């Protein structure tokens, strides 16, 4: 069953010539055609490109190359620019946009030999926590087809969880890798801000966005992140720091690891069954040699209001470039330039995107800048300081990834704040720029739940190490949704 293999298993099998990259690619493309109509996880399937890349990978291997990702099939969240392939960002605005270049992440993974099966569905312009705001329709959670897979990287999560492919790229602005990973039983990592290049990654909130992988295991995430990470002179926020050997980091024993449990993560609003699952993970980590300490992150309560000022403010600026002039959707028969701008944007953007543009424009407007935007940035500094203080005492911070398991499609549509609250545990890592990882922690009523790990800047290896060691003594990550 080729579709059940992890990236690491695929690497070993290709090296042993048990099958070819082309054979694997054709198998998974057939699986996507057969099963994705149930999920709606792909916006574009790139059959011809994938088969050409698979043949090239087989040729490279025949010539003596043996990279871990050579011939590995993946797909990209549809906000990474891909040369010659539509890059829609889940929006009508970019429905006809074919990128003339590859994003750095796409380029780096292609250089490592990966095979691109297609582009994955997402919340429009990455704005959402449930993958319901996409112009191409909602993505369904393979664990329960009437429920959301999380967002905004919901297509990436659903496709990997349903074994349509072993790994995918995602992006995380307020939890958009970690939250869908938790709701679909995957491992997903948001690297430190500046660790992975944002060049060619269509921006939502530039000071918060960060690309990363979703896969089934920490080992697979280590393989992906090793290829994605690194300095990029084309991205002014990219950090010139050597990339750790994430695979080597996996093997370290956890003896002496200090884990912090923030009391704010276990308060009102958390499903008690998720709290039990998280504490069961803590007990296993203690058996592996870790010690546990209660800590406090006192400013966490202000994270959601601060985030929903900063992110929309940056979005209102970033999305001003979509005006119907150079590329993207253009309204029919505009009367004049102003009419072109107004109607192209009114018709091209969906309601959630328009909501956030309006909030952001308001927060940045002359009379309100100090009261909202400046205040939110001050709170951001306090949140960052809380983490600096906490990491003086502990090595990793652990808690739930989400307060609830996946909810039903449409259930929270009339109450956007209840959707925003699903990101309460993930947003702080983006505001502070810290690395965060979600890994499978069990099930509640048959629905997956995740545990989140946070570490100091550029300590992705430590997160992957803890997750990998836990996955050696647990089997949650091996469970597959029925029918897939």
Swiss-Prot record:
Single GO cellular component term: glutamyl-tRNA(Gln) amidotransferase complex
Catalytic activity line of the entry: L-glutamyl-tRNA(Gln) + L-glutamine + ATP + H2O = L-glutaminyl-tRNA(Gln) + L-glutamate + ADP + phosphate + H(+)
InterPro entries tied to this protein: Amidase (IPR000120), Amidase_CS (IPR020556), Amidase_dom (IPR023631), AS_sf (IPR036928), GatA (IPR004412)
EC number(s) per entry: 6.3.5.7
PROSITE patterns: AMIDASES (PS00571)
MF-aspect GO terms: ATP binding; glutaminyl-tRNA synthase (glutamine-hydrolyzing) activity
Leading EC class: ligase
Active site per UniProt: 77 (charge relay system), 152 (charge relay system), 176 (acyl-ester intermediate)
Gene Ontology BP annotations: translation
Signal sequence residues: none
UniProt keyword annotations, A-Z: ATP-binding, Ligase, Nucleotide-binding, Protein biosynthesis
Assigned protein family: Belongs to the amidase family. GatA subfamily.
Protein task: Allows the formation of correctly charged Gln-tRNA(Gln) through the transamidation of misacylated Glu-tRNA(Gln) in organisms which lack glutaminyl-tRNA synthetase. The reaction takes place in the presence of glutamine and ATP through an activated gamma-phospho-Glu-tRNA(Gln).
Subunit organization: Heterotrimer of A, B and C subunits.
Protein name according to UniProt: Glutamyl-tRNA(Gln) amidotransferase subunit A
């Amino acid at each position: 069953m080729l579709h059940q293999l992890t990236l690491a298993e695929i690497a070993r099998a290709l090296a042993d010539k048990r099958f070819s990259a082309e054979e694997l690619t054709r198998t998974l493309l057939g699986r996507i055609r057969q099963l994705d109509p149930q999920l709606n996880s792909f916006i574009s399937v790139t059959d011809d490109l994938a088969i050409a890349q698979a043949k090239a990978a087989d040729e490279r291997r025949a010539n003596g190359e043996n990279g871990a990702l050579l011939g590995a099939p993946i797909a990209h969240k549809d906000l990474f620019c891909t040369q010659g392939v539509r890059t829609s960002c889940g929006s009508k605005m970019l429905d006809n946009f074919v990128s003339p270049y590859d994003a750095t992440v796409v380029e780096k993974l292609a250089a490592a030999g990966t095979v691109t099966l297609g582009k994955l569905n997402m919340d429009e312009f990455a704005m959402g926590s449930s993958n319901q705001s996409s112009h191409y329709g909602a993505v369904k959670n393979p664990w329960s087809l009437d429920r959301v897979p999380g967002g905004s990287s919901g297509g990436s999560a659903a496709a990997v969880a349903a074994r349509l492919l072993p790994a995918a790229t995602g992006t995380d602005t307020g939890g958009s890798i970690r939250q869908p990973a938790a709701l679909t039983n995957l491992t997903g990592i948001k690297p430190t801000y500046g660790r992975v290049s944002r060049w060619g990654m269509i921006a939502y909130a530039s000071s918060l966005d960060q690309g990363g992988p979703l896969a089934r295991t920490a080992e697979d995430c280590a393989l992906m992140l090793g290829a994605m990470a690194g300095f990029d002179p084309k991205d002014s926020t990219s950090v010139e720091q050597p990339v750790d050997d994430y695979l080597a980091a996996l093997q370290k024993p956890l003896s002496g690891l200090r884990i912090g449990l923030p009391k704010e993560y276990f308060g009102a609003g958390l499903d008690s069954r998720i709290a039990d699952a998280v504490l069961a993970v803590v007990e296993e980590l203690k058996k592996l040699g870790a010690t546990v300490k209660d800590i406090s992150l006192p400013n966490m309560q202000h994270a959601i209001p601060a985030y929903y000022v900063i992110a929309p403010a940056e979005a209102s600026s970033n999305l001003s470039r979509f005006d119907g002039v150079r590329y993207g959707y253009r309204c029919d028969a505009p009367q004049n330039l102003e009419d072109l701008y107004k109607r192209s944007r009114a018709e091209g953007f969906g309601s959630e995107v328009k909501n956030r543009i309006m909030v952001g424009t308001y927060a940045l407007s002359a009379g309100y800048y100090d009261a909202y935007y400046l205040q939110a940035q001050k709170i951001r500094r306090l949140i960052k300081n809380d983490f600096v203080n906490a990491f003086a005492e502990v090595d990793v911070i652990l808690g739930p990834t989400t307060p609830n398991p996946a909810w039903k499609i449409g259930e929270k549509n009339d109450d956007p704040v209840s959707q925003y609250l699903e990101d309460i545990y993930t947003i702080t890592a983006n505001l502070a720029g810290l690395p965060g990882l979600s890994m499978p922690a069990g099930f509640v009523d048959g629905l997956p739940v995740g545990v989140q790990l946070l570490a100091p800047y550029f300590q992705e290896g430590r997160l992957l190490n803890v997750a990998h060691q836990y996955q050696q003594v647990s089997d949650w990550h091996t469970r597959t949704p029925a029918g897939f």
